[in-house]
């Protein structure tokens, strides 16, 4: 496989609508037929490079490789030479030893540099601009929750801060025809991927709403996320920014009172800061599909690995 022919998952920008739909269908197939893929990664290794903290991404990728007969290698950025060397050169070496690489980095630009050096498929396990694997599991969860309803009839409402998860949600929903409404009181320009937004606007799948009641009244799903990036949440140097954000965003909390105005089910990509963007009562309540959503990361990761190595 030459470098020019290697397929990566950095964002949905490099995937066609039909490729995204095919990947979604395949992820659902893998979940329903896990035993059929028990040995597909035999003799193969996945390098997992972490610059950001993780629970779900590490667990799901490592378990995915184990269940498929392969091996997941955990690499801590600070304990590796990625922190010392040119990223593309380290990636060029690493890709000579493994079949696929997953990287969870702070800067999207670093992931692009890593892609330029990798001779094997590179998966974005989350960066500051995109989180494609999360959005695949999100839509997989919706498709499994309402299999009788075509995706282009689904209304998804996101309430929170415009971030990497939102960019990936915009990309995948526009590809699949899902209507996405954003209620994003905080939407800083540097966090918005304009190409992704413009494509969705052109397709008519994306809209914005300031009235919270109007945004949720016809929603099938209400989705929220942390109001401050996880690596900064407990950082004392961000205390003032955190305080300002919490005060601004508290009226947009997902709570029982808000849910009285909608029949929507509730989603969150985790980790959760209960009492801020969502109450613990809602997280554990009957409308929550948050843990199904998190569980589906496992089969979504399997599907991504298998598809990229098949390409």
From Swiss-Prot:
GO-annotated molecular function: amino acid binding; ornithine carbamoyltransferase activity
Record key words, sorted: Amino-acid biosynthesis, Arginine biosynthesis, Cytoplasm, Transferase
Chain residues that bind L-ornithine: 164, 225, 229-230
Pfam families listed in its UniProt record: OTCace (PF00185), OTCace_N (PF02729)
Protein name: Ornithine carbamoyltransferase
Localisation per UniProt entry: Cytoplasm
Binding site for carbamoyl phosphate: 54-58, 81, 104, 131-134, 268-271, 279, 297
EC number: 2.1.3.3
Residue spans crossing the bilayer: none
InterPro entries the record matches: Asp/Orn_carbamoyltranf_P-bd, Asp/Orn_carbamoylTrfase, Asp/Orn_carbamoylTrfase_sf, Asp_carbamoyltransf_Asp/Orn-bd, Orn/put_carbamltrans
Gene3D superfamilies assigned to the protein according to its UniProt record, in alphabetical order: Aspartate/ornithine carbamoyltransferase (3.40.50.1370)
Site (Important for structural integrity): 31
Family under the similarity heading: Belongs to the aspartate/ornithine carbamoyltransferase superfamily. OTCase family.
Any one biological process term the GO annotation gives: citrulline biosynthetic process
A Gene Ontology term for the protein's cellular component: cytoplasm
Taxonomy, superkingdom: Bacteria
Transcription recorded as keyword: no
Pathway recorded for this protein: Amino-acid biosynthesis; L-arginine biosynthesis; L-arginine from L-ornithine and carbamoyl phosphate: step 1/3
Catalytic activity: carbamoyl phosphate + L-ornithine = L-citrulline + phosphate + H(+)
Function: Reversibly catalyzes the transfer of the carbamoyl group from carbamoyl phosphate (CP) to the N(epsilon) atom of ornithine (ORN) to produce L-citrulline.
Organism: Leptospira interrogans serogroup Icterohaemorrhagiae serovar Lai (strain 56601)
């Amino acid at each position: 496989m030459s470098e020019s022919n290697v397929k990566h998952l950095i964002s949905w920008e490099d995937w066609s609508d039909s490729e995204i739909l095919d990947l979604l269908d395949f992820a659902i197939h893998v979940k329903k037929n896990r035993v059929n893929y028990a040995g597909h990664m035999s003799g193969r290794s996945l390098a997992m490079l972490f610059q950001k903290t993780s629970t779900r991404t590490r667990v799901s990728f490592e378990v995915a490789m184990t269940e498929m007969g392969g091996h997941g290698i955990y690499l801590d950025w600070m304990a590796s030479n990625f922190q010392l060397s040119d990223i593309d050169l380290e990636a060029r070496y690493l890709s000579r030893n493994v079949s696929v690489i997953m990287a969870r980095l702070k800067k999207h630009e670093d992931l692009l540099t890593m892609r330029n050096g990798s001779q094997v498929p590179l998966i974005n396990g989350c960066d500051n601009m995109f989180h494609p694997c999360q959005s695949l599991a999100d839509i997989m969860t919706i498709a499994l929750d309402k299999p009788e309803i075509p995706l282009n009839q689904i209304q998804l409402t996101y309430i929170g801060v415009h971030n990497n998860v939102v960019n990936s949600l915009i990309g995948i929903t526009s590809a699949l025809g899902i209507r996405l409404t954003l209620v994003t009181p905080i939407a800083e320009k540097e966090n918005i991927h304009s190409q992704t937004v413009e494509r969705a606007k052109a397709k008519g799948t994306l809209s914005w709403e300031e009235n919270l009641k109007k945004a949720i009244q016809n929603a099938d799903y209400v989705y929220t996320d942390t109001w401050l990036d996880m690596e900064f949440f407990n950082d004392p140097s961000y205390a003032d920014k955190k305080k300002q954000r919490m005060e601004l965003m508290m009226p947009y909390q997902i709570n029982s009172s808000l849910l009285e105005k909608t029949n929507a089910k509730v989603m969150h990509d985790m980790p959760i800061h209960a009492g801020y963007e969502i109450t613990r009562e809602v997280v554990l309540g009957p409308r929550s599909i948050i843990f199904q959503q998190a569980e589906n990361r496992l089969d979504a990761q399997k599907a991504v690995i298998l598809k990229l190595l098949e390409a």
